[in-house]
Amino acid sequence: MLFFFGKIKNASGFSSNQGGAYNADDIVIGNIIFENGVLFQGLWCFTVPEEEALDLCEITGSKGKMSLSIFGEPEITITKNGKSSKISFQKLEHVQQPMIEKVVQYFLGEIENPSSASEGVEVMRIIDAFTSAKGS
């Protein structure tokens, strides 16, 4: 979301280990206020039954919304004035490969770091904000 909406004004959230299957928190709720006024709310639950799993990102604006899956179907649904249209595209087979190659090249000393330290620190700050308040 940082790529789409820019700098963050505030981030907060809660996390908990509901399932108890492992030591890490398995549910996270995160909220972000971006500097441009965009509001974000995310929910990640890693212990739902397979038939209840949902991979959905919705971006809602004053004229409609855009819905898409992050890891699922390669399509975007645009809803405007109550009417929906779908844009389908070919699923990228190796979507992470270019970044992995750059990271390997960086560790081999062949290129500069593909991600700045400040970007990494910002992502870690958001993760900490999402998970610092415990729900249980």
Question: Language-model segments: which ranges?
Answer:
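A structural signal for well-ordered alpha-helical scaffolds and beta->alpha junctions
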Residues: 1, 96-100, 120-123
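Contiguous beta-strand/loop segments that form the cofactor/metal-binding neighborhood of enzyme cores
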Residues: 2-73, 100-111
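Short acidic, glycine-rich loop/turn motifs
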Residues: 32-36, 78-83
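C-terminal helix-rich "cap/oligomerization" subdomain common to oxidoreductases
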Residues: 35, 103-136
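Short amphipathic beta-strand/extended segments with alternating polar/hydrophobic composition
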Residues: 42-44, 67-70, 79, 83-93
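Juxtamembrane/interface motifs at transmembrane-helix termini
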Residues: 60-63, 88-89, 134-136
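Active-site loop of classical SDR/Rossmann-like NAD(P)-dependent oxidoreductases
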Residues: 89-101, 115
